[in-house]
């Protein structure tokens, strides 16, 4: 596994409007199986703490998840979805005229050329139903389709969310159990998922292959308009909820994919705060309930209400449809007309309108509890958050842009004043639930702090208000305003949406207004509002622009809700006891005949879930042929040379006049005892000052001159080698004309930053611990994966020390040590720098067009000449591992994260490309059916790290523990009993190639080239693996069973779970787990 640690050390841009998705839309796929967390390669990425695993299959893949240089979000405490314009060529000339559109049943409402994305956009209206269609045409090969319904719920039973899952479980034309999974298996999709927002449900797909794209479109259109689920109670029970009783003598339990997903959500304090915030700000409209579903309310949902919700809202009259890319605009309408013409007009568009929340006349205050562990001082684990609903109606683009700019000025970088003052106050550990939210009908702004002592809650509230008042009175530093403006303009020019298709980002941007019956074109046109904002700042000064916004929308706004979250170590157990009591009463109310019938129904559902679809049904799902697949891998044009004796990789790609660069240093001379300090060392490089610059000035300089700089460690096993690859990478980007500034600032960060600010370092430790604790609760599968890797290979051990449970334990100890031995810590940070900073073994990777690369070489040479010749330390041998054992990590949670792993190379397996096909097939069939569908977990997957030989299984938000491990152990028998036909095998191969050839932006291509070089992955070897993939046979599946058996027999199991479930497991299998309690 290749690992990269972000270390909270990125200084870079986010998006034009700097949206903070504090309550992210729920998606159909879990993070253990979802393309929403898939890197640019299409591979699943395991995140833990500061770790983002990136490139495990470099033999195969063009792309990897962008690491630190991909935006961290405004303050690192909440997630953001970058939405940027796309730089493409002008639109294709073939566009439906009015007559042609009329023949297909559409009228043209409006038409514009959007210069910001160099696209021709036409808004059509289907005359019969009123369905609106945005048809965006350009030369982007990554085609995107999306259909969005307005779906405002009236309660928290989770109807929109359960329906989002269920419509993808078979339809009129595709009557198998889950055509969605068939698409996962055998499509070249670059995006395939679905989202539930608080007031709408989105179904987007994307592909670069035209035939594949329209296959996806047809399956999705049939799924939303003609799903089987409205006539099949079993789908409702499977995806939503049902009573489960295996034997009348046993206890009844709740099961259901969404039910367990939301149990996981309601186990995370940050998520609870986000939901409380939304509901408290908007108690009178649809935002006052949880569209995802509250686990206490989900069992109140009936099948009849479920069916009625679909009938009411899933109608063309209530739909907005988006097309984007280089496909034929006429064909788009032709495909749509076949579906839309089957419907008449409906009042759904009127009945689904979201009513605005009326503004409060005075502020309100709410106190809520959240589940906490028993360890530590609970009095210091409060959270406090101030929240404002900014307006009683949507804002115009000009005001929205100005508020987004203001948001970035206040919170966007470590040097931003509101963020800086709160974190330096000592009143809390990290920001939480903070930033501007403008994706819903009415915009919101929040600022919160976690790790607050109970006697400091009032002080935090006062500090927030006093700081906002001071900012309104005094304004912002000129350099800060310039840095923010450069950040915005760089972001718009770069158009970097990471692994998400650009057309999807534009769709989500457009739909945020369109869904409320506003102009869908307006959000795509930023040039004039930005030009106007810059002119206002230049003419009147930034204070006259931003101070009135602070006054009007925050300080003088009575619609403010202050939320205090208090830790409650008994909350989780009380909720479990309450659920158990409800189920006991349900059972007590049943007769013997009722219980027998429930046990029969439980078995009936299980049999249906575990019975495969007949081959004829599977053939209904359209798919590609192997003849559609290129026989050769995609190559990155990389030239290896040197500058002043240092190796330089040049990736000649069009980047829209942007230079991307990585400078790589070897960690081989860093002492073992300093390893765990490296993430904090990386953060310190970017968030401490120099002799001449404060850290604020340094941050502003980076913001003004570049598109961002990040520093992070990277570790990976290397195929065929015992010693791991361990590097420290400095990554940056700038306009080509600013290349000299970029390399000067990189040099400044590496050589001039001083480790003298004790209080700032203490903040880093507290912030890192808070992030780790949040990830342990919400991404336990990543923690489990890291522990298993640390037991099985050296690179895994190194990574876990810097980003897993061991790192969290280290942070707890370090917090005390900062006060006791700061001089020693400061000296250790300096020693780390001396140990790796050297020209010797350094590699520079650059990505831009050839001319720009040539023009940049002189700045690279100057940078390299300033580096020390040799590192100060001697080479260190890394050979540590965690002891092999089955381990259970206790956290306060209502769901579990269950893993098992083993090294199949150790058992004699020789790498073959077929292993990638087989691994994907296991995830999409055996584990999907048994762990998710039958078991009720939100996700289950497997992963093969071809660099180390570690094969691992993971589940996510799982109600089970030992049962899931038994499923993993049955994988070998599953493979031996497999009887796949040619179509199924072809789908598995094509789906794997889809991962291998997934779409990449230029910076990701250049970064992938670097990683392949570091891990000795040649193009010749990639060709061999590709040929092995394409020639995979049933015999390969059978033979791989033996390798999987070694995981069952000799592997290690790690579970992140509740104390109750771990105790039950150890009772059932005497002392199966060694128990380790996480300090939360």
Curated annotation (Swiss-Prot):
Pfam families: M16C_assoc, Peptidase_M16, Peptidase_M16_C, PreP_C
Location of this chain's protein in the cell: Plastid, Chloroplast stroma; Mitochondrion matrix
Active site residues of this protein: 164 (proton acceptor), 239
Expression sites (tissue/organ): Expressed in leaves, flowers and roots, but not detected in siliques and shoots.
Originating species: Arabidopsis thaliana
Cofactor mode of binding and number, as noted: Binds 1 zinc ion per subunit.
Activation and inhibition: Completely inhibited by the metal chelator orthophenanthroline.
First and last residues of the transit peptide: 1-84
Protein name (record): Presequence protease 2, chloroplastic/mitochondrial
Subunit structure: Homodimer.
